[in-house]
Amino acid sequence: MWVLALGGAFLAVAKACIFCRLQDHALANRLAQLNNQTKPKWKWKEWASPDFSAFALDEVSMKQVTEKTHRVLRVIEKKGSTSLIPLYWQWLQKTRIPQYTREALCAPVCRGSTILYNCSTCEGKEESCWPQKHCYPDSHDLWDARILLLCIFGIVLLSGVVSLQVEYLNLQAKDL
């Protein structure tokens, strides 16, 4: 029963971004073969979420994720260590794909708009780039930089006026 459930999980995640490009790597078939070799040691629901609709990647990122998955599966196939699949899959879903999604929608990669591929359907759609504040919430935008420069300029100007006044008073004291 567990083998069937695990097989269902692999088929469900077969809609993921890693299967959208580079078909010659046959990742879906290789993942199915690894699944057939697996004795279920883990609960598939804990790691194999079939919902990839929150993720969208550009062409370059999708190829990078596919190549990375190809290399990881090759290592798993050579070692015969199928227990690494859930760890890799969790890392992919929780860390790498969200990072690539953010990079694809933020400057400097994105300029105005970009074509992103939905990771569930593999269909491309033109999307607007995210605003700077959304991409880098802790960073200062151009308006903040202007205010900072004006404050620094004001402080320097004020210290210059104070310094000039002190020098003027010193010169007057020497003349007397």
Swiss-Prot record:
Its main location: membrane. Disulfide bonds join C17-C119, C20-C122, C106-C129, C110-C135. Expressed exclusively in testis. Keywords: Cytoplasmic vesicle, Disulfide bond, Fertilization, Glycoprotein, Membrane, Signal, Transmembrane, Transmembrane helix. It is found in: Cytoplasmic vesicle, Secretory vesicle, Acrosome membrane. Glycans are attached at N36, N118. Residues 17-146 are extracellular. One of its GO terms (cellular component) is sperm plasma membrane. N-glycosylated. Residues 168-176 are cytoplasmic. It is a single-pass type I membrane protein. One of its GO terms (biological process) is fusion of sperm to egg plasma membrane involved in single fertilization. Disruption phenotype: Males are healthy, grossly normal and exhibit normal mating behavior but are infertile. Sperm are morphologically normal, exhibit normal motility and can penetrate the zona pellucida and bind to the oolemma but are unable to fuse with the egg membrane or penetrate into the ooplasm. No effect on location of sperm-egg fusion protein IZUMO1. Almost all Tmem95-deficient spermatozoa are unable to fuse with oocytes; however, a small but significant population is unexpectedly able to fuse with oocytes. The chain crosses the membrane at residues 147-167. Residues 1-16 form the signal peptide. Belongs to the TMEM95 family. Sperm protein required for fusion of sperm with the egg membrane during fertilization. Does not interact with sperm-egg fusion proteins IZUMO1 or IZUMO1R/JUNO. This is Sperm-egg fusion protein TMEM95. It comes from Mus musculus. The gene is Tmem95.
